[in-house]
């Protein structure tokens, strides 16, 4: 059977092991071809091919529900649920999402982009099933990286207290999240995987039994026998899980279809919560990805033979994350109090560079954003300079800790929010739209954003040097503007002070962060129409430079704000509030992300869809404030 013929996962029922192995081969081929062409997550999905096939072969997915954690490990799931034939649109505008979306398929039972949510959602569905007197299976598939998240442990704690609620938790244990896992839980799982009795029984039991005359060929009961002997040989296998109220199976070879199918069939018969521990290899089937599991977690388009990224047509400036990591590491070399903290995102944030150079000044807490923030608060209490490098979208997970543990106590923690603004192909779960709004309302917190990578360097110095309380900096995904950078000697910025980049009497353009460059482009377009605009780089949304902005607003009589974030509660709102507070009643036009979700697409496509290109903004300004002028041509 060809994979393109499978439009429903129940078509796996009745297929032989050989046929299922062929399906697995086709999934890996399609997975590799697609990601090599258009980019996406590579290692996670390759590691769960057999797990997915085996589980779906034992379920009725017209009724039963499977909840995937994170979602980027669910590419095989997408191919088996009717999306093979348009899988080449993965992560492209109007194409298949890189994560799970309930609106995309009836088989995507719960949306996922952030880690550690699956067990909670699955338990909720299981309880709803029981409350409504229905009868179907619910399974959650979670990686060992996501299992370091407190939310997953909270859900396990709850589920283990419900002995009459049927729920299957499947641990996809590949010893990795994006980077190698950290912490006691990971260490415990590795002991289980790598214990000598488990390894011997997994590798040699069938071969040994073949030599016994009364056994002959390996019987269908071998997997059950193997499981029982593992328990006798290693009493501690799964002991912690079973003490928490789960029936434990494992560890199971995650690439042995026969063993997986037999184990899942046994587990389905268990009454109450059951935990199936599956040992997999991240990147399975692509040797380069197996050897470099961090580097091949996610890829831009690459050459399948060499594994090397396809070079761009022209050189690109260094990315913001790279500049951040380089600058912070240089500062940390001369300041042993600087401690970089990441929540399992060392590579993404660039803190792996700090780890390599100054390992004693680096902490990876695992997927534990709440802990990361309060840990930083504790470090700050004792005079250290904690720098929490975190994606904007993930800081949302620690909002209470930001308020309660940092800002109320006015502790000097430096939050560096990567991927702020429009992130592109990762879509709504990863867009960094909300940080300006959700942080601006918190007392004691200073918030800033650089206009380019050179100003990023100065803001890093500003944040490290600021000891009067907490401070946050947002910066985007992707490459800088190509401005000259300094290797040292960066000067801190005065807190709460912006700068004038261009003078004009007709209009005030206030840009924040990445939109400062756009504001300059808008001013150029307006200048072609005889309209001269003052352009201000705000630098700080809190405290806002009202000493600069208010007089300029009075002088020009027209104000336009530009930001790469949500309009509600954002930078434009801060400006409008300040003008009202100073009784300056001038028209204000705000440009940013409206009250909507921004789907996956290339960033420039999203900017155009949102009306945030320089030509679109200039046209709108002309129509709103200068109705006699002809609009420019939108490129």
UniProtKB/Swiss-Prot annotation:
Per the UniProt entry, the Enzyme Commission number(s) are 2.2.1.7
Give the record's GO CC terms. Answer: cytosol
Note the SMART domains from the entry. Answer: Transket_pyr (SM00861)
An example GO BP is:
isopentenyl diphosphate biosynthetic process, methylerythritol 4-phosphate pathway
Which annotated residues bind thiamine diphosphate?
Answer: 72, 113-115, 145-146, 174, 286, 369
Write down how the cofactor binds this protein. Answer: Binds 1 Mg(2+) ion per subunit. Binds 1 thiamine pyrophosphate per subunit.
Q: What InterPro entries does the entry give?
A: Dxylulose-5-P_synthase, THDP-binding, Transketo_C/PFOR_II, Transketolase-like_Pyr-bd, Transketolase_BS, Transketolase_C, Transketolase_CS
An example Gene Ontology molecular-function term: magnesium ion binding
Catalytic reactions of this protein: D-glyceraldehyde 3-phosphate + pyruvate + H(+) = 1-deoxy-D-xylulose 5-phosphate + CO2
Could you list the residue ranges forming a coiled coil in this record?
Answer: none
Binding-site residues for Mg(2+), renumbered to this chain:
144, 174
The answer to whether the entry has keyword Transferase is yes
NCBIfam families, per the entry: dxs (TIGR00204), PRK05444.2-2 (NF003933)
Q: What is this protein called?
A: 1-deoxy-D-xylulose-5-phosphate synthase
